[in-house]
């Protein structure tokens, strides 16, 4: 009876408690077995098995859902656990549940050779930074058509703008470089793309979409506030 009276009071007082079903493409972060199944279903429906690391994908999706000020249903994942010789950048259309792009992408020259193993948020480090970003506006600069990135994680990537970390095309990110040197060329910390595909990718992800740069680094996982709840359950 007490519960009934409380319920009547809440309704009459105008209090509304929303109940929503969890979804891998939604903006909520609700941890439940059904939600994990939903993410697995999304992964399967996009036919990502053998193409995308599921652990990286799930982290990217969970972070995407937790970032409320995103303006696009587009998610970009860069998987730095893979070598530069492999296509390790993925762009997903979360609304229509499909992968739009899969491309090579360079890492910072001081992050490693073929593999990126060291990361930094410091100016002049010439290293890549992990974590979640929001894309902003484009401009034409020294590297041509470029996309500004806003690092969302304090102490991890929040100096991205100060460091001029942007998405841009570069000749050293072209596939032909791999044939000559055994790995892709490296940037000063930017996620640089092959020149032929850089503009289409930038246009697809600009204007407030989420980007997640992943690597298997325990120190990042320990520091990330965006993924703290997720990692405790994985």
Would you name each region that the model predicts?
Residues 1-29:
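Bacterial Sec-dependent N-terminal signal peptides
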